[in-house]
Amino acid sequence: MTIKAQPTLHTARLELVPLGHEHREFTMKLDMDPEVMKMVAFGRPFTEDEAIQVHTWLMNCATSVPGFGTWVGFAEGEFVGWWVLAPVPTTENPKSFRTDRTEYGFRVSPKFWGQGYAKEGAREMVRYAFEELGLAEVIGETMTINMASRAVMAGCGLTHVETFFNKYDTPPPGIEEGEVRYSITREEWLRMQKPSMTRSRWFPAFASWLPRLLLSRLWSYIFQGRRLAAGAASP
């Protein structure tokens, strides 16, 4: 499979554009927002220097494995958030990356919380990873108590596969309950697509002949009713 440069992606409401230097203000604003960061990393907003480092890392994801990278999402021209397909280091060498597996993540502006944008962008990441990149697995991680992020992963078809515990110099509140890893394989994702694909094939035809069938039955009943009424009125 030939992997082209990181493409612009689209969903029903989002235009997902490859992250560029011109988007640094957007990513930094999210990373320095206390509400956004309370269940991420240190559990506190990043400093300006830390936010710059995160933006640099997000940019570098596009050079790690062909097709991977970060996308910034816009709805009707307004910045919504970012989504990333990040590289997963190999067990043999942390400086080399697996080409069949990715870890996805996202941040969404609080203005757009509760409107389905996080899941909409995440589903497109999963679709792109399997359908266009041909990857074998997509994983995601978050704090155990971060139920919103867990709901997004579950909504994309990922299932909980592991709870783990890391040690942090400055542990965020709630980290004592651990972190969770979710996963979905390409085969699992493909099985999820088959029912919807089947429905999309038969529904248009079904929708076209169902009204005709009902109308035919209705006319038959009316006609039969008239005959019975006429027979009852006959001497």
Swiss-Prot record:
InterPro entries: Acyl_CoA_acyltransferase, GNAT_dom, N-acetyltransferase
Record's keyword annotation contains Transferase: yes
Domain N-acetyltransferase: 14-190
EC identifiers of the protein: 2.3.1.-
UniProt induction comment: Expression is induced during iron starvation.
Pathway: Siderophore biosynthesis
Disruption phenotype: Eliminates TAFC production and increases FsC production about 10-fold. Does not affect the production of FC.
Top enzyme class: transferase
Source organism superkingdom: Eukaryota
GO molecular function: acyltransferase activity, transferring groups other than amino-acyl groups; lyase activity
Keywords: Lyase, Transferase
Positions annotated to bind CoA: F106, R107, V108, G114, N146, A151, V152, M153
Entry-linked Pfam families: Acetyltransf_3
Described purpose of this protein according to its UniProt entry: FsC-acetyl coenzyme A-N(2)-transacetylase; part of the siderophore biosynthetic pathway. Aspergillus fumigatus produces 4 types of siderophores, low-molecular-mass iron chelators, including excreted fusarinine C (FsC) and triacetylfusarinine C (TAFC) for iron uptake and intacellular ferricrocin (FC) for hyphal and hydroxyferricrocin (HFC) for conidial iron distribution and storage. TAFC consists of 3 N(2)-acetyl-N(5)-anhydromevalonyl-N(5)-hydroxyornithine residues cyclically linked by ester bonds; FC is a cyclic hexapeptide with the structure Gly-Ser-Gly-(N(5)-acetyl-N(5)-hydroxyornithine)x3.
UniProt protein name: FsC-acetyl coenzyme A-N(2)-transacetylase
